[in-house]
């Protein structure tokens, strides 16, 4: 695996590069000449064109907003660009479908990409560098929320823009908490677990206290990060010291014991997220951790079910801890014309406008991705409403949230860890010690 990745990296070349010059008039003239030459190579859309966009925004509220957003762009852009969307399921499904399509030479021009997939596609030279368009249009990259640029840059190129990024939220049933004598959201994992046990005991085992689905780079990553400060993968993306420093062993043992004791829900084998939410809406689950990207959908469904919903910061060992996840939009440069790439950039630029960013957050719960959007009256007024406190929380905890390192190993390591977690927590086929041994074996192959 490692040899293939290195080979891919060696073949990666930059399409555009600038040499910083200064001082003499001669140097300045050369610099200006180079800039003009570079800008002349950046296409502007000349004729009406249709481009495709593959995404994971298939839930009710997500899809409704996406359609509204695309319809507005299609009607208002001055170039005659038509964007056609194709839902692919979840982000992992987008990655799988895109991999197949690229191999067949039939890929979309745009895709919403996961943190797992971005380094793979970037290292293979699949993603177009947006830098020339950014420079031509004076797009301010400093306006993009710094913490959300972790998967934007690759080898000095801008290969994505943050689009459906999110943190996690603790969604909890306020009435169940109140009935158990709990009048505030937990401030640490230890406190959350204490609450969960109390709710479980008070219901004679009828109501689980808390639940997590299996998402190694997201829900489990931040719990590990609260133990070891790096999560499930090292900061350089080249190893997993959590396997040797005791943090993974502690987490595997704890999670197994929580579910064994009954108060922590075991995620379903299929449609785990939907199943867990249904238990919550039916009053069978006191709290669960899910993405802020689902805040609007969860809020609406909880209200319809008569659930008094609370939304709070996520917690890890010893205090607050949160993950960063979600998707970033990339332009697929491989096998596409400069006209298609230019059209795709116009859509990306539209999505990054203040009003689009603000409404994307309001309508769905995904994070606002630009500082200027946070300063709009649209967002300020929305956050000022007490019932939207959870949305504001999602943005406030970004500064302390973490995501796995951008690494070409992330996708494969994520798959291996997910499989072992499933064997331990869902199938109950192995012990925590066996799970750790299996992970060490997988790591020795992946990070060889």
Residue ranges of predicted features:
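Conserved N-terminal structural module of periplasmic/extracytoplasmic solute-binding proteins
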Residues: 4-8, 21-124, 138-139, 184, ...
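Short, solvent-exposed loop/beta-turn-alpha elements that line the ligand-binding surface or hinge
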Residues: 43, 131-144, 208-210, 214, ...
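Extracytoplasmic/periplasmic substrate-recognition and gating elements
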Residues: 75-76, 180, 260-264, 300-367
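Short helix-initiation/N-cap motifs at beta->coil->alpha
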Residues: 87-97, 116, 189-194, 267-281
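Hinge/lid segment of periplasmic solute-binding proteins
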Residues: 115-167, 204, 220-227, 247, ...
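Long, aromatic- and glycine/proline-rich binding clefts that accommodate carbohydrate-like moieties
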Residues: 151, 309-312, 362-419, 423
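Extracytoplasmic/periplasmic solute-binding protein
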Residues: 154-163, 168, 193-241, 256, ...
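Glycine-centered hinge/linker elements that transmit conformational signals in sensory
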Residues: 196-198, 238-269
């Amino acid at each position: 695996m490692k040899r293939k990745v290195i080979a891919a990296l060696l073949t990666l070349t930059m399409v555009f590069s600038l040499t910083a010059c200064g001082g003499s008039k001669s140097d300045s003239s050369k610099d200006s000449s180079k800039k003009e030459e570079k800008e002349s190579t950046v296409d502007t859309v000349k004729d009406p064109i249709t481009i495709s966009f593959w995404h994971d925004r298939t839930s009710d509220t997500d899809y409704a907003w996406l359609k509204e957003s695309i319809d507005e762009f299609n009607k208002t852009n001055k170039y005659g660009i038509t964007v056609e969307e194709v839902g692919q399921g979840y982000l992992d499904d987008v990655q799988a479908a895109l991999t197949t399509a690229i191999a067949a030479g039939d890929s979309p021009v745009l895709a919403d990409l996961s943190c797992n997939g971005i380094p793979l596609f970037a290292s293979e030279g699949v993603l177009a560098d947006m830098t020339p368009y950014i420079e031509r249009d004076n797009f301010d990259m400093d306006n993009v929320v710094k913490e959300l640029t972790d998967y934007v840059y690759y080898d000095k190129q801008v290969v994505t823009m943050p689009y459906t990024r999110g943190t996690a939220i603790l969604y909890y049933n306020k009435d169940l908490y109140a009935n158990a004598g709990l009048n505030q959201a937990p401030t640490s994992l230890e406190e959350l677990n204490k609450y969960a046990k109390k709710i479980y005991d008070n219901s004679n085992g009828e109501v689980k206290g808390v639940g997590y689905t299996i998402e190694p780079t997201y829900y489990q990553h931040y719990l590990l990060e609260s133990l070891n400060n790096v999560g499930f993968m090292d900061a350089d993306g080249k190893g997993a010291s959590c396997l040797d420093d005791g943090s993974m062993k502690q987490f595997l043992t704890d999670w197994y014991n929580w579910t064994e004791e009954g108060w922590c829900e075991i995620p379903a084998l299929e449609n785990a997220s939907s199943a867990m939410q249904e238990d919550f809406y039916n009053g069978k689950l006191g709290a669960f951790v899910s993405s802020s990207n689902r805040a609007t959908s969860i809020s609406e469904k909880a209200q319809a079910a008569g659930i008094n919903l609370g939304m709070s910061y996520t917690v890890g060992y010893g205090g607050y801890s949160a993950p960063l996840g979600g998707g970033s939009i990339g332009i697929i440069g491989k096998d596409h014309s400069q006209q298609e790439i230019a059209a795709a950039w116009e859509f990306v630029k539209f999505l990054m406008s203040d009003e689009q960013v603000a409404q994307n957050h309001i309508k769905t719960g995904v994070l606002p991705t630009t500082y200027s959007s946070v300063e709009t009256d649209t967002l300020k007024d929305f956050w000022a409403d007490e019932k939207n406190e959870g949305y504001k929380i999602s943005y406030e905890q970004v500064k302390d949230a973490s995501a796995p390192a951008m690494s070409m190993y992330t996708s494969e390591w994520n798959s291996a860890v997910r499989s072992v977690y499933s064997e331990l927590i869902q199938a109950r086929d192995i012990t925590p010690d066996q799970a750790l041994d299996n992970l060490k074996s997988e790591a020795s192959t992946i990070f060889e």
